[in-house]
């Protein structure tokens, strides 16, 4: 039974179901989450199943080990229109 469970978990990891990613999670308008203090980002990243901090030089939340379904910011798909 343990071998079967191990096989299922290994298979799921290989097909990417249990994989995680890192990046700047975006808001509904496509912009990064603005921050100055770490505790704000820690709460956001925990919501997405990971951990994170405020990347001070960019004033944006960076998250590690968040779920793959979480939309993250990228330069190629940037839809944020800063006001």
UniProtKB/Swiss-Prot annotation:
UniProt keyword list: Disulfide bond, Ion channel impairing toxin, Neurotoxin, Secreted, Signal, Toxin, Voltage-gated sodium channel impairing toxin
Gene Ontology MF term list: sodium channel inhibitor activity; toxin activity
Coiled coil: none
Cellular localization per UniProt: Secreted
Annotated signal sequence range: 1-19
Pfam assignment, any one: Toxin_3
Domain of life: Eukaryota
Propeptide: 83
Domain LCN-type CS-alpha/beta, first and last residues per copy: 21-81
Expression tissues: Expressed by the venom gland.
Main location: secreted
Cysteine pairs bridged by disulfides in the record: 31-80, 35-54, 41-61, 45-63
GO cellular component: extracellular region
SUPFAM superfamilies tied to this protein: Scorpion toxin-like
UniProt domain comment: Has the structural arrangement of an alpha-helix connected to antiparallel beta-sheets by disulfide bonds (CS-alpha/beta).
Role this protein plays: Sodium channel inhibitor. Possesses potent toxicity in mice but induces only paralysis in cotton bollworm.
Family stated for the protein in its record: Belongs to the long (4 C-C) scorpion toxin superfamily. Sodium channel inhibitor family. Beta subfamily.
UniProt name for this protein: BmKBT-like peptide
Lineage: Eukaryota, Metazoa, Ecdysozoa, Arthropoda, Chelicerata
């Amino acid at each position: 039974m343990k071998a079967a469970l191990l096989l299922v978990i290994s298979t799921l990891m290989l097909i990417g179901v249990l994989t995680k990613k890192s990046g700047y999670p975006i808001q509904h308008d496509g912009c990064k989450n603005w921050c100055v203090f770490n505790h704000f980002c820690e709460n956001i990243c925990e919501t997405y199943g990971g951990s994170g901090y405020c990347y001070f030089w960019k004033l944006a939340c960076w998250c590690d080990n968040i779920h793959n379904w979480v939309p993250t910011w990228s330069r190629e798909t940037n839809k944020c229109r800063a006001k």
